Amino acid sequence: MTTSSTKTTAQAHGRYIRGSASKVRRVLDQIRGRTYRDALIMLEFMPYRSTEPITKVLRSAVANAENNLGLDPSSLMISTATADMGPPMKRYRPRAQGRAFAIKKQTCHISISVSATQSTNSEDSD
Protein backbone atom coordinates (compact mmCIF):
# COMPACT_ATOMS: atom_id res chain seq x y z
CA MET A 1 0.00 0.00 0.00
CA THR A 2 1.29 3.41 -0.92
CA THR A 3 0.27 6.25 1.32
CA SER A 4 1.95 8.98 -0.72
CA SER A 5 -0.68 9.03 -3.47
CA THR A 6 -2.57 12.30 -3.78
CA LYS A 7 -6.33 12.22 -4.02
CA THR A 8 -7.53 13.68 -7.31
CA THR A 9 -11.19 12.65 -7.31
CA ALA A 10 -14.10 14.63 -5.90
CA GLN A 11 -17.72 13.59 -5.88
CA ALA A 12 -21.18 14.97 -5.24
CA HIS A 13 -24.58 13.38 -4.76
CA GLY A 14 -28.09 14.56 -5.45
CA ARG A 15 -30.61 12.64 -3.39
CA TYR A 16 -34.34 12.22 -3.96
CA ILE A 17 -34.33 14.01 -7.31
CA ARG A 18 -37.79 14.08 -8.87
CA GLY A 19 -37.67 12.10 -12.12
CA SER A 20 -37.06 8.55 -13.23
CA ALA A 21 -33.57 7.08 -13.13
CA SER A 22 -33.78 5.85 -16.72
CA LYS A 23 -34.48 9.34 -18.05
CA VAL A 24 -31.57 10.75 -16.04
CA ARG A 25 -29.26 7.96 -17.25
CA ARG A 26 -29.78 8.88 -20.92
CA VAL A 27 -28.29 12.30 -20.17
CA LEU A 28 -25.50 10.99 -17.94
CA ASP A 29 -24.43 8.51 -20.64
CA GLN A 30 -23.74 11.42 -22.98
CA ILE A 31 -21.60 13.47 -20.57
CA ARG A 32 -19.64 10.64 -18.93
CA GLY A 33 -15.93 10.82 -19.83
CA ARG A 34 -16.06 14.43 -21.04
CA THR A 35 -14.36 17.48 -19.62
CA TYR A 36 -16.21 19.79 -17.27
CA ARG A 37 -16.52 22.57 -19.83
CA ASP A 38 -17.77 20.26 -22.60
CA ALA A 39 -20.32 18.70 -20.25
CA LEU A 40 -21.70 22.11 -19.23
CA ILE A 41 -22.11 23.13 -22.87
CA MET A 42 -23.86 19.86 -23.69
CA LEU A 43 -26.18 20.11 -20.70
CA GLU A 44 -27.13 23.67 -21.57
CA PHE A 45 -28.47 22.72 -24.99
CA MET A 46 -30.07 19.34 -24.26
CA PRO A 47 -33.89 19.37 -24.39
CA TYR A 48 -34.40 17.23 -21.28
CA ARG A 49 -35.83 18.28 -17.92
CA SER A 50 -33.24 16.22 -16.03
CA THR A 51 -30.37 18.47 -17.16
CA GLU A 52 -31.08 21.02 -14.41
CA PRO A 53 -30.46 18.73 -11.40
CA ILE A 54 -27.53 17.08 -13.23
CA THR A 55 -25.94 20.49 -13.80
CA LYS A 56 -26.43 21.34 -10.13
CA VAL A 57 -24.76 18.11 -8.97
CA LEU A 58 -21.93 18.55 -11.50
CA ARG A 59 -21.22 22.10 -10.31
CA SER A 60 -21.20 20.83 -6.72
CA ALA A 61 -18.67 18.11 -7.58
CA VAL A 62 -16.40 20.65 -9.28
CA ALA A 63 -16.72 23.01 -6.31
CA ASN A 64 -15.72 20.13 -4.01
CA ALA A 65 -12.67 19.44 -6.18
CA GLU A 66 -11.73 23.11 -6.23
CA ASN A 67 -12.20 23.85 -2.52
CA ASN A 68 -11.29 20.56 -0.86
CA LEU A 69 -8.56 19.29 -3.19
CA GLY A 70 -7.29 22.50 -4.78
CA LEU A 71 -7.81 21.27 -8.35
CA ASP A 72 -8.25 23.54 -11.35
CA PRO A 73 -11.79 23.29 -12.83
CA SER A 74 -10.45 23.48 -16.39
CA SER A 75 -8.48 20.25 -15.87
CA LEU A 76 -11.39 18.19 -14.55
CA MET A 77 -13.07 15.31 -16.33
CA ILE A 78 -16.24 13.41 -15.40
CA SER A 79 -14.96 9.99 -14.35
CA THR A 80 -18.19 8.40 -13.10
CA ALA A 81 -21.81 9.45 -13.38
CA THR A 82 -24.60 7.20 -12.15
CA ALA A 83 -28.31 7.43 -11.46
CA ASP A 84 -29.91 4.96 -9.06
CA MET A 85 -33.57 4.52 -8.24
CA GLY A 86 -34.89 6.30 -5.19
CA PRO A 87 -38.06 5.61 -3.24
CA PRO A 88 -41.28 6.49 -5.07
CA MET A 89 -43.47 9.28 -3.76
CA LYS A 90 -46.91 7.79 -3.23
CA ARG A 91 -49.91 9.88 -4.17
CA TYR A 92 -53.58 8.97 -4.59
CA ARG A 93 -56.03 10.09 -7.25
CA PRO A 94 -59.72 10.04 -6.35
CA ARG A 95 -61.82 7.94 -8.70
CA ALA A 96 -65.50 7.18 -9.11
CA GLN A 97 -67.63 5.62 -6.37
CA GLY A 98 -65.21 6.35 -3.53
CA ARG A 99 -62.24 4.53 -4.99
CA ALA A 100 -58.68 5.83 -5.15
CA PHE A 101 -55.89 4.86 -7.54
CA ALA A 102 -52.28 4.95 -6.38
CA ILE A 103 -49.81 7.10 -8.28
CA LYS A 104 -46.10 6.46 -7.81
CA LYS A 105 -43.93 9.43 -8.71
CA GLN A 106 -40.39 8.23 -9.35
CA THR A 107 -37.30 9.67 -7.67
CA CYS A 108 -33.62 8.97 -8.24
CA HIS A 109 -30.21 9.52 -6.69
CA ILE A 110 -27.55 11.14 -8.91
CA SER A 111 -23.84 10.59 -8.19
CA ILE A 112 -21.09 12.34 -10.16
CA SER A 113 -17.32 12.01 -9.65
CA VAL A 114 -14.80 14.30 -11.30
CA SER A 115 -11.07 13.67 -11.51
CA ALA A 116 -8.06 15.58 -12.75
CA THR A 117 -6.92 14.74 -16.28
CA GLN A 118 -3.34 13.73 -16.93
CA SER A 119 -1.97 16.31 -19.37
CA THR A 120 1.02 14.45 -20.80
CA ASN A 121 2.52 15.50 -24.11
CA SER A 122 2.94 12.07 -25.70
CA GLU A 123 1.98 13.53 -29.10
CA ASP A 124 5.19 15.56 -29.28
CA SER A 125 7.50 12.53 -29.03
CA ASP A 126 7.87 11.49 -32.69
UniProtKB/Swiss-Prot annotation:
* Alphabetical list of Gene3D superfamilies matching this protein: Ribosomal protein L22/L17
Its domain of life reads: Bacteria
GO BP terms in the entry:
translation
Which positions are tagged coiled coil? none
Q: Which segment of the chain is annotated as a signal peptide?
A: none
**InterPro entries for this protein:** Ribosomal_uL22 (IPR001063), Ribosomal_uL22_bac/chlpt-type (IPR005727), Ribosomal_uL22_bac/org-type (IPR047867), Ribosomal_uL22_CS (IPR018260), Ribosomal_uL22_sf (IPR036394)
Provide one Gene Ontology cellular component: cytosolic large ribosomal subunit
Keywords assigned: Ribonucleoprotein, Ribosomal protein, RNA-binding, rRNA-binding
Cross-referenced PROSITE patterns, in alphabetical order? Answer: RIBOSOMAL_L22 (PS00464)
Question: GO terms for molecular function, please?
Answer: rRNA binding; structural constituent of ribosome
Regarding protein family, the annotation reads: Belongs to the universal ribosomal protein uL22 family.
Q: How does it assemble?
A: Part of the 50S ribosomal subunit.
- Functional description taken from the UniProt entry: This protein binds specifically to 23S rRNA; its binding is stimulated by other ribosomal proteins, e.g. L4, L17, and L20. It is important during the early stages of 50S assembly. It makes multiple contacts with different domains of the 23S rRNA in the assembled 50S subunit and ribosome. The globular domain of the protein is located near the polypeptide exit tunnel on the outside of the subunit, while an extended beta-hairpin is found that lines the wall of the exit tunnel in the center of the 70S ribosome.
Name of the protein this chain belongs to: Large ribosomal subunit protein uL22
| Natural source organism | Prochlorococcus marinus (strain NATL2A)
Whichever gene encodes this chain, its name is rplV
